[in-house]
Amino acid sequence: GPQTTYTYTDVAPDAWYADAVNYVVSTGVMSGDDTQHLFQPEYGVERSQFAVIMYRFAGGTPTEEDAEFSDLTGDEWYYEYVKWMVGKGLMGGNGGAFDPSGFLSCEQAIIVLYRLAGEPTVTGTLDDYPYAPKVSESGRDAVTWAWNNGLITEKECVWYPTQAVSRAQVALLLMRYDALIGQNAA
């Protein structure tokens, strides 16, 4: 049947992220505030929130392994999702801490998707990517892959590597990843 369109007062039908928001909401990967009818597309995404989103997106399953981080007790509502991300090698910590409330950068979000894809062989360059000098050495392959496969383009918004990734950008990345590779690639 026809796909349901979810209406949020802060998502204009012609916004560059409108289709992507509809995609993530209709697939249950992300949700908005349904009482306020807001998706909050410009909001940043915390590392713990991204773990939940990716778990849903990739069809994660509970894991017995523990994730040892100095700033997690194991009682957090998002702990199961973080454990899954870490167990899959999609995310790690920094200096023994996970930093659950830290905001994810554009580059970090792209690295996670690149890992989910199995770190495919990279073809192409970042020669025409305007922020190439800002890409970290460890993120170069992932960003090159995303740029050359159209996961990020200059048409919709600024994909500045170190900038906090927005909910709209995450929605767009996931929709394009699904089109490129398929949702349940984990």
Which stretches of residues belong to each language-model region?
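Feature responds to low-complexity, polar/acidic, surface-exposed segments characteristic
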Residues: 1-18, 26, 31-51, 55-80, ...
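PEST-like intrinsically disordered low-complexity regions enriched in serine, proline, threonine
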Residues: 23-24, 85, 146
